[in-house]
């Protein structure tokens, strides 16, 4: 995209309330999927359950893709045993809540990110119609089989 067109494009996106740094950061995504699709993704409400080995990398990809509204659920803290497989497990995060740590990281990548942290252990009884319909996308990275089953049933039903 030539410079003048790009400047007009950025100005156009600012009218939709986008932070210019986020747009520049996601320029390659926008070039690939288009501005309308990017706007849909950026404003989607996403729930991520679990921030361990799979969930941590998933969260990083969501934030770096420009998604602004992410709710994360994880009751756990980072431990020594997490260092070999979890992206956010560092000396600084040791014994700290996973949800809080990833939220801080998200703001360093995208200052417009709105991360909601739920420091709780999700139970199968928590999976209700109201719970699943609050989000546009639900990503399951938890290690509780009963929660996984209820979540799949609820998502298919609602």
Q: What would you call each of these model-derived segments?
A:
Residues 119-126:
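Conserved SAM/SAH-binding loop
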């Amino acid at each position: 995209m030539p410079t003048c067109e790009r400047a007009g494009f950025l100005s156009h996106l600012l009218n939709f309330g986008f932070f210019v740094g986020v747009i520049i950061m996601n320029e390659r995504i926008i070039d690939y999927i288009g501005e309308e699709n990017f706007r849909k993704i950026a404003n989607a409400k996403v729930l991520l359950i679990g921030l361990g080995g799979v969930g941590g990398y998933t969260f990083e990809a969501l934030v770096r893709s420009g998604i602004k509204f992410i709710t994360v659920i994880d009751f756990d803290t980072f431990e020594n045993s997490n260092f070999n497989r979890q992206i956010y497990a560092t000396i600084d995060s040791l014994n700290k809540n996973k949800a809080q740590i990833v939220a801080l990281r998200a703001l360093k990548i995208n200052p417009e990110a709105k991360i909601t942290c739920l420091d709780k252990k999700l139970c199968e009884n928590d999976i209700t119609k109201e719970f699943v319909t609050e989000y546009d996308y639900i990503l399951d990275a938890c290690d509780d089989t009963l929660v996984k089953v209820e979540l799949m049933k609820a998502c298919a039903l609602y």
